[in-house]
UniProtKB/Swiss-Prot annotation:
SUPFAM superfamilies: YajQ-like (SSF89963). The keyword Ion transport does not apply. Gene3D superfamilies: 3.30.70.860, YajQ-like, domain 2. This is Nucleotide-binding protein PSPPH_4093. HAMAP family: YajQ. It holds the Pfam family DUF520. The keyword RNA-binding does not apply. InterPro entries: DUF520, UPF0234-like_C, UPF0234_N, YajQ-like_sf. PANTHER family: UPF0234 PROTEIN YAJQ.
């Protein structure tokens, strides 16, 4: 039976490149020159600046750099800014993987669409199986139209 997996993955190398591009853009911006920094560790970016409006501008720079590298900005989890001495800090976490709650919503959406496919949760991915390839393509189209709050990719397509 044909099947495919629904996953949410990030290319860590592209994320690193996007953060590096954001750092370069920060150095080029006249209004932010020398006033803010990006620190990248694993999948967390810490933004440091003197004021809230600078943090907002830095988040926009980061989002733009990620989109240029073909990474969906939906994967960002932006936490509240907090004061650290004279500076303001804010953490941005890049989310990866499908948690159980989102997996249940994806399975429910596929069932609501009344397609001739079955969906099963397997860890951090959802396996969709059907009798025909056309049914799977309809399921992919339905999931692309569905706003899950996370970027979804489809891989491991088997006939």
């Amino acid at each position: 039976m044909p099947s495919f997996d629904v996953v949410s993955e990030l290319d860590k190398h592209e994320v690193t490149n996007a953060v590096d591009n954001a750092i370069k853009e920060l150095d080029r911006r006249y209004d932010l020159k020398g006033k803010g920094t990006f620190e990248f560790k694993e999948l967390t970016v810490t933004l440091t600046a003197e004021a809230d409006f600078q943090l907002e501008a830095m988040i926009e720079i980061l989002k733009l750099a990620l989109v240029k590298r073909k990474i969906d900005a939906k994967c960002l989890e932006i936490k509240d800014a907090y004061a650290s001495g004279k500076l303001m800090k804010q953490e941005v976490t890049l989310r990866e993987g499908i948690d159980k709650e989102l997996a249940k919503k994806i399975v429910a959406h596929i069932k609501e669409a009344k397609l001739k496919v079955q969906a099963a949760i397997q860890g951090e991915q959802v396996r969709v199986t059907g009798k025909k390839r056309d049914d799977l393509q309809e399921a992919i189209a339905a999931l692309r139209a569905y706003d899950s709050g996370m970027p979804l990719q489809f891989n491991n397509f088997r006939d």
